[in-house]
Amino acid sequence: MRVAFAGTPEFAATVLRGLLGSGHEVGLVISQPDAPRGRGRRTASPPVALLAREAGLPLLQPASISEAAGEISRHDALVVAAYGQILRPDTLYAARHGAYNVHASLLPAYRGAAPVERAIMDGERETGVTVIRMDEGLDTGPVALQRRVPIPPDMTGGELADLLARVGAEALVEVLDRLESGTLNLTRQDSSRASYAPRITRQDQEIDWSRDARRVHDQVRALSPHIGARTRHPEVEGPLKIWRTRVHREAGRELAPGELRAGDGRLFVGCESGVVEILELQLPGGRRLGAAEFLRGHSLTGALRR
């Protein structure tokens, strides 16, 4: 089949790589425009655009994907993975077989923009990938294929996204194979079972140390390595970012929620139930440091707070 591909971040680039290794032809790639990125705010291309140029594929980066509807109509299907815009009907139905989306959850669970982070933050032990034929709703289209993936207890959001992208690429190729052969079956979603995964906000980043240690750990790993969970200390101007933690299971005295204890190059924080060990953190304007390196140059006493 000849397909058009729309996607933007690294998740989508991984899906595109898998598609390029299949027997299907990618006739067009659509990605978001170049934009200022990183701490230096230098203009840079998104990962999908970089991959398209590297592979010599036709590339469009319109302000609105609707501008590409005419080009999309020359393809058998439009494939979407984390593109970053809601598609209007003129784009959804432009290709001969419509549009198919690779979504990083087991729909109808976790519809929306942040399914990977939300699943980990909720302590889910399993997630997956769903390929749907897109309709005009938010991740509401009929299911073409699902693949289940376990979530290990210490896996980060970045690690899970990478895994789901690889699984999603394989699932997408299988869907296109079935679509081409006329054997693809679609199943309606049960919207009564739907849950939602809105974009991560600043409030979602703030650590509440009065929660259970496992929930705090899940929040930190969900937001690592790109977003970061945040906390504050009276002696530090601005938020501290916490990048890696583990639930501390060794015997020791209980710590009050937010209370700090440092020793032997290790840093512990009390929670409502249990203790979290901070493994990697970052001061405002600084670089990420392991706990031992951080403690060699800094001293934190007292308590952390929201």
UniProtKB/Swiss-Prot annotation:
Molecular-function GO terms, alphabetical: methionyl-tRNA formyltransferase activity
EC number, UniProt record: 2.1.2.9
Binding-site positions, (6S)-5,6,7,8-tetrahydrofolate: 105-108
An example Gene Ontology CC term for this record: cytosol
Keyword Cell membrane: no
Swiss-Prot/TrEMBL catalytic activity: L-methionyl-tRNA(fMet) + (6R)-10-formyltetrahydrofolate = N-formyl-L-methionyl-tRNA(fMet) + (6S)-5,6,7,8-tetrahydrofolate + H(+)
Domain of life of the source: Bacteria
The UniProt record lists the keyword Transit peptide: no
Pfam families in UniProt: Formyl_trans_C, Formyl_trans_N
Keywords from the named record: Protein biosynthesis, Transferase
InterPro entries per UniProt: Fmt, Formyl_trans_C, Formyl_transf_N, Formyl_transf_N_sf, Formyl_transferase-like_C_sf, GART_AS, Met-tRNA-FMT_C, Met-tRNA-FMT_N
Family annotation (SUPFAM superfamilies): FMT C-terminal domain-like (SSF50486), Formyltransferase (SSF53328)
Alphabetical list of NCBIfam families matching this protein: fmt
Function: Attaches a formyl group to the free amino group of methionyl-tRNA(fMet). The formyl group appears to play a dual role in the initiator identity of N-formylmethionyl-tRNA by promoting its recognition by IF2 and preventing the misappropriation of this tRNA by the elongation apparatus.
Name of the protein in question: Methionyl-tRNA formyltransferase
Upper lineage: Bacteria, Bacillati, Actinomycetota, Rubrobacteria, Rubrobacterales
